[in-house]
Curated annotation (Swiss-Prot):
It comes from Arabidopsis thaliana (Mouse-ear cress). Keywords: Chromatin regulator, Metal-binding, Nucleus, Transcription, Transcription regulation, Zinc, Zinc-finger. The record marks 210, 216, 220, 225 as: Histone H3K4me3 binding. PROSITE patterns: ZF_PHD_1 (PS01359), ZF_PHD_2 (PS50016). This is PHD finger protein ALFIN-LIKE 6.
């Protein structure tokens, strides 16, 4: 996406400078320029990507046409999930994917120019000194740093990160299969009811029956169940959704 206007970084310092510039551009898109960024990510458009540029700017554009691309590509289709999630959750999801993309670009340069073990380690240490984009946009940058210090001082104390991860995984597990009709009175009865519900569940988009090996998600507005693939929601996206609305319910809300 950047064309030939930006010099190719070749040393650890140059790669880190490139990383820092792209990171600054992405943070700007998700904070100061949030209104413009949100409006640019129109779900009616084709698959869009958020690019951070080395000169601390950003752009939303279609992915490059060349295959394979010159540089690793950022997450594709960020605009599709915009109206199906709360704005805060959507921004957090874009931030997580942006963090992943920044690392892939930095270590792509490292591999391309033959960085050795010590150079890769130094690059990672320099990058790791900076808060992630997700930490910045969620306001957890300072809290995360303090947590890291506390963990280093006392290994016996459990990490808060682990508990948050467990909560997220638990949430996805609950979303992946239809729940029982009501709170169960006894274990045996709850198992029977759960099996009946799963067998009778139908996707609100395609009409197919529930399958145990498929990811499902329920709309909090109409309470219909959908295949994740039918509404373009993955388990990773579901972790960041507090109140999911299907495309139909989202469109109803958008109409004046």
């Amino acid at each position: 996406m950047e064309g030939i206007t930006h010099p190719i970084p070749r040393t650890v310092e140059e790669v880190f400078s490139d990383f820092r510039g792209r990171r600054a551009g992405l943070i700007k898109a998700l904070t100061n320029d949030m209104v413009k960024f949100y409006q640019t990510c129109d779900p009616e458009k084709e698959n869009l990507c958020l690019y951070g540029l080395p000169n601390e700017t950003w752009e939303v554009n279609l992915p490059v046409e060349e295959v394979p691309p010159e540089l690793p590509e950022p997450a594709l289709g960020i605009n599709f999930a915009r109206d199906g999630m709360q704005e805060k959750d959507w921004v957090s999801l874009v931030a997580v994917h942006s963090d992943s993309w920044l690392l892939s670009v930095a270590f792509y340069f490292g591999a391309r120019f033959g960085f050795g073990k010590n150079e890769r380690k130094r690059l990672f240490q320099m990058i790791n000194e900076l808060p992630t984009i997700f930490e910045v946009v969620s306001g957890n940058a300072k809290q995360s740093k303090d947590l890291s210090v506390n963990n280093n001082n006392s290994k016996s104390k459990p990490s808060g990160v682990k508990s948050r991860q467990s909560e997220s995984l638990s949430k996805v597990a609950k979303m992946s299969s239809p729940p029982p009709k009501e709170e169960e009175e006894e274990e045996d009865e709850s198992e029977d009811e759960s099996e009946d519900d799963e067998q009778g569940a139908v996707c609100g988009a395609c009409g197919d029956n529930y399958g145990t090996d498929e990811f499902w998600i329920c709309c909090d507005a109409c309470e219909k169940w959908f295949h994740g693939k039918c509404v373009k929601i993955t388990p990773a996206k579901a972790e960041h959704i507090k109140h999911y609305k299907c495309p139909t319910c989202s469109n109803k809300r958008a109409r004046p």
